[in-house]
Design a protein with these regions (language model features):
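N-terminal redox-cofactor-binding region of secreted/periplasmic oxidoreductases
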Residues: 1-105
Length: 105
């Protein structure tokens, strides 16, 4: 918690050339590249990627649907699915969906 508070205090100090919302794979890379010659603020609503199951490929089974690392979104019911709604896992952690997908492409 102290690290998060420290990060928030640093974020509130000054102006930024770029603000990137979402620290998934693309957001992290974009912030890194933009900050080479400018200032960039990277915002992420989720927490640290310190959950053991995000480090093990088979761990995606324990990540998807887990409110600690997944937003828990569902699709709208679809007629072609007999009115069912499907789970739509989205990463709520640094690294985004790449942290919870078990390295599956």
């Amino acid at each position: 918690m102290a690290d998060e508070t420290k990060s928030m205090e640093a974020a509130n100090m000054g102006a930024y050339d770029y603000i990137i919302v979402g620290a998934g794979s693309a957001g992290g890379v974009l912030a890194n590249r933009l900050s080479e010659n400018a200032t960039a603020l990277l915002l992420e609503a989720g927490g640290k990627d310190d959950y053991i199951w995000t480090k093990i490929p088979v761990g995606y089974l324990f990540c998807m649907g887990n409110p600690r690392v997944d937003w828990g979104f569902k699709t709208e019911p679809e007629a072609g699915l007999n009115g069912r709604a499907l789970d739509y896992p989205r990463g709520k952690v640094l690294g985004g969906c790449s942290s919870i997908n078990g390295m599956i492409y």
